């Protein structure tokens, strides 16, 4: 997972910055952000007869001519010509491992698979997709999918049917858990039937839902730990997307930006920090971050909010208690600008963060709480800036801002299996 996320997030930043900085105008982009709650049945025998497991799943959505982010999936287009029915992409996708939540942390959460996809569009509604995917141990599976998109007024529906081939190593790892049981099973083919739905409520607000059922192959079903042949899942939630009732703007008010910050770790939680009661890290661990802001839109529900997709690269400096590490972030950030009496702006970002080596501030907290730490965590950013040009009455500086931001990694209070089902994380006060 480490190398794939590293390459993917770094390439995302390069592609976005290259495209946007070359344009004199910034048109409104296809974007979205959502909060989903997933519940799935557990097909395995469990000690406490747990039949379902649930997780909170924040999602981002974005697409331009170079790449896309679609909820739990993202990719880079290798071939995508407007006059062709074919499309080829390098993709990554989160795959849920549905076991009781009490043991998900020991299993180190869900998995991110990487691979390639070829898509063929039969017409404006129906398409076929072929994928070859692998996990971080290069255990392979392939997907053969037929799917469609239909719109009926405020409703959008996406039915799909997928046949999945799993090699013996993949099947043994995720359906007989060979490392724990010693049981090896053969390759198999399972089938999944599902449907996604999106309903436009008003303006930028949408309701989201998804359900599917999977029929396990005979090799998986006859594993000594599998109890049920059929497994179901349901997603429900809401999100903010482009208002389908409005024509997209051809020239946005907000422009791309680059943000550089330096920060200091604190063992304090977010509540104490906002109360101005933060403790200093005794080892003075520090970080330096670089973020690029790609404009998505300049309003939400008719309010003047500047919305950005913001990939970032963070260097955590070595100290007496940690070696250096690199963090990769991708998030969606909203800014609200106001006058008091000079021009200020307040920002909030939500996204995900991957770090190649766990920092001291996170490792010590996880050790105290008895968790296995997770490299992949949820990301939050809160910032307040003052406009330098306004502050010094210099028109040439009106695009420059200076201020404070809180750099936060966490796992959503044990409610997210994809983040290792842990509670806690790290905070850095940055300027």
Task: Label each PLM-derived region with a short phrase.
Residues 29, 52-58, 108-114, 138-142, ...:
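Residues that define the transmembrane beta-barrel architecture of outer-membrane proteins
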Residues 51, 99-105, 158-198, 225, ...:
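Outer-membrane beta-barrel translocator/channel fold
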Residues 23-68, 165-169, 233-295:
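Short glycine/proline- and aromatic-enriched beta-strand/turn motifs that initiate or cap beta-hairpins
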Residues 22-29, 66-85, 125, 151-157, ...:
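Short loop/turn motifs that connect adjacent beta-strands in outer-membrane beta-barrel proteins
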Residues 200-256, 379-431:
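Predominantly the C-terminal beta-signal and adjacent terminal strand-loop region
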Residues 29-35, 58, 67-69, 86-90, ...:
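Transmembrane beta-strands of outer-membrane beta-barrel proteins
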Residues 37-43, 64-66, 92-98, 132-138, ...:
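Transmembrane beta-strands of outer-membrane beta-barrel pores
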Residues 35-37, 58-64, 78, 116-120, ...:
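Residues on the lipid-exposed face of transmembrane beta-strands in outer-membrane beta-barrel proteins
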């Amino acid at each position: 997972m480490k190398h794939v996320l590293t390459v993917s997030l770094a390439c995302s930043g390069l592609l976005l910055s290259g495209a946007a900085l070359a344009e004199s105008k910034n048109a409104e982009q296809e974007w979205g952000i959502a909060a989903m709650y997933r519940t799935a049945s557990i097909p395995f025998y469990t000690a406490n007869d747990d039949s379902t497991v649930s997780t909170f799943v924040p999602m981002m959505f974005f697409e331009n001519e170079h790449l896309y982010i679609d909820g739990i999936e993202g990719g880079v287009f290798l071939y995508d010509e407007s006059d062709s029915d074919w499309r080829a992409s390098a993709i990554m996708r989160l795959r849920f491992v549905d076991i009781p939540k009490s043991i998900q942390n020991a299993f180190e959460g869900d998995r991110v698979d990487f691979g390639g996809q070829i898509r063929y569009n039969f017409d404006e509604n129906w398409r076929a997709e072929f994928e070859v995917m692998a996990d971080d141990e290069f255990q392979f599976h392939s997907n053969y999918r037929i799917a469609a998109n239909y719109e009926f007024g405020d409703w959008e529906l996406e039915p799909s049917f997928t046949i999945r081939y799993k090699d013996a190593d993949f099947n043994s790892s995720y359906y007989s858990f060979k490392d724990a049981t010693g049981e090896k099973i053969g390759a198999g083919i399972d089938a999944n039937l599902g449907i996604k739905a999106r309903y436009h409520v008003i303006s930028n607000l949408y309701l989201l839902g998804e359900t599917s059922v999977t029929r396990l192959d005979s090799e998986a079903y006859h594993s000594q730990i599998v109890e049920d042949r059929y497994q179901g899942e349901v997603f429900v939630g809401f999100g903010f997307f482009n208002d389908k009732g409005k024509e997209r703007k051809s020239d946005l008010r907000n422009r791309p930006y680059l943000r550089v910050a330096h920060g200091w770790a604190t063992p304090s939680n977010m509540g104490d920090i906002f109360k101005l009661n933060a403790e200093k890290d005794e080892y003075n661990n520090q970080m330096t971050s670089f973020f690029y802001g790609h404009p998505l839109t300049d309003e939400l529900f008719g309010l003047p909010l500047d919305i950005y997709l913001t990939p970032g690269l963070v260097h955590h400096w070595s100290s007496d208690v940690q070696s250096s590490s690199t963090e990769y972030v991708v998030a969606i950030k909203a800014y609200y600008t106001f006058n008091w009496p000079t021009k200020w702006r307040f920002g909030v970002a939500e996204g995900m963060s991957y770090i190649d080596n766990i920092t001291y501030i996170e490792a010590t907290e996880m050790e105290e709480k008895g968790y296995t730490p997770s490299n992949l965590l949820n990301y939050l950013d809160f910032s307040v800036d003052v406009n330098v040009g306004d502050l010094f009455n210099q028109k040439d500086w009106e695009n420059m801002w200076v201020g404070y931001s809180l750099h936060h990694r966490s796992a959503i209070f044990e409610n997210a299996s994809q983040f290792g089902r842990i509670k806690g994380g790290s905070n850095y006060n940055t300027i």
